[in-house]
Amino acid sequence: MSAKERVVILVVMLMIGGCAMQRPVPPPSTFEVQPLVKEMWTPKADNLVLVLDASSSMAQDYNDFEKFDIGRRMLARFNKTMPDLSINVELRSFGHSLSYSLQSTIPVYGLSPYSRAGVANALSTIVPAGGPSPMGKSLQAVAVDLQGADGKIAMVVVSDGKDMGNTAMDAARELNTQYGNRLCVYTVLIGDDPAGRTLLSEMSQVTGCGQAITADDVDTGAAMAEFVTTVLLDKADSWIFRDIKFESDKAVLMASSYPTLERIIQILHENPELSVEIQGHTDSTASAVYNIDLSQRRAQTVMKYLHDKGIDAARMTTHGYGEGRPIDTNDTEEGKANNRRVELKPLQ
């Protein structure tokens, strides 16, 4: 064998070896986002804190894929699934390669009004994984971040739970002491480390209202939607639409109402199992008897519009409540305008 042939064989062997060492390309995702319709839900938390483990153990593989990639993907799907809520959100990471940050924990998206695009962008910047595992320090920082926050708090911790020591549980207990029944802790295990599973399970029980799951548990759109609901949402008793306007003292829709009505049609088309009661409401300008009749006629006007747009009449009923269920004062013009409204109540 000539020297040239030996060189060619060596190059081929190195190429084969290099290919064998590469991570497999993930198969096409079967995950389909099932977005939750904002109008059908009310937030049960006023603040959402996402904590992502970016330490060196997360750079290890689980089922042939890097755990850190699995964790980031899980949070990205959570972000895509949750409704566009009026809540504050924080994304804090810990660990980090020195090439990303010299700090062991940082608020990548500081506590501020929720922006789906903002959270997605912040999440995409956290690369690569590396460094120690100071979860305890990260949770202590969260306690400080939340000091000015009002209302309920939901915290989702995404980690493999490895190499955390005792400080992580100590910090979780301190958070519970500081925020009490305002706080619920949810944990998502990446991988299958037994000690990590135990740690995250115990952490989720600190507040008495959390849950421990694995990333594998939310690998479908339906499962992720259920988890987002558990963390953030309560079913809305009714959907209030103040943008459905009528001509004064009439049951004739104003043109400004149509965009909102089209949104209702979209919701009903996307949820074909859903039936609704269309509820009409008025202010207190006229007599109570007159307002009952007016509110009923307005509800029927909305029902006719929806039916003409393809919504089965069997899915809809109407009820006029007149002035009897105000959501604002009738002593001001603004309050009266808020009380002149249509609500849709989901029926089981």
Residue ranges with predicted function:
Residues I16-G18:
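C-terminal motif of bacterial Sec signal peptides marking the signal peptidase cleavage site
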Residues A20-Q22:
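Bacterial signal peptide processing site
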Residues P26-L36, W41-S159, D163-N166, V188-T198:
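Von Willebrand factor
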Residues D61, G165, H281-Q348:
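Periplasmic OmpA-like peptidoglycan-binding domain that tethers envelope proteins to the cell wall
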